[in-house]
A protein has these predicted regions:
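Catalytic glutamate of the conserved HExxH
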Residues: 109, 113-117
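Active-site rim/adjacent substrate-binding subdomains
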Residues: 1-105, 117, 121-124, 134-135
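Short, glycine/acidic-rich hinge or "gate" loops at secondary-structure transitions
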Residues: 127-128
Length: 135
């Protein structure tokens, strides 16, 4: 299904949607995500793409960069805060091509990337998503 060329959500819209997704989580998860920065970029950088072995900038919709909480220590200092980046153009393309609700898409990608903050791998996240779909 291809969506008509509706005005795409702005970066500010997407940032609000992602923040709302985080706020929808139970409090103990929100507390652990309090220092995670959410960034909206048009596309991933070459360095970001290379870090996850993805060739095309159109194929990456979100990325977690940072140390998962199970690898953090109270003695860590000088680290940048963890970042969840959402890539606007690939997300808009997926929204237009699939017809999925844009808010649901942002929620899905944001929560997926937040899962990496808790130490979950892509395989772990996909297994949880599949299990949730079968409930």
């Amino acid at each position: 299904m291809t969506r008509p060329l509706l005005p795409p959500p702005t970066a500010a819209d997407m940032e609000q949607m992602a923040a709302s997704s985080i706020r929808s989580l139970p409090e103990h998860f929100r507390r652990e995500l309090a220092d995670v920065v959410i960034k909206i970029e048009e596309f991933a950088t070459r360095e970001q793409l290379d870090s996850v072995d993805i060739a095309s900038r159109w194929d990456l919709t979100g990325l977690y960069e940072g140390r998962p909480i199970d690898e953090q220590s109270q003695w860590d200092s000088g680290d940048l805060p963890p970042i969840i980046s959402l890539f606007r153009q690939p997300l808009i393309r997926e929204w237009r091509e699939t017809g999925v609700d844009f808010g649901a898409l942002i929620h899905h990608v944001t929560i997926h990337e937040a899962g990496h903050h808790f130490g979950l791998s892509d395989d772990d996240m996909h297994a949880l998503e599949d299990a949730a779909d079968n409930i």
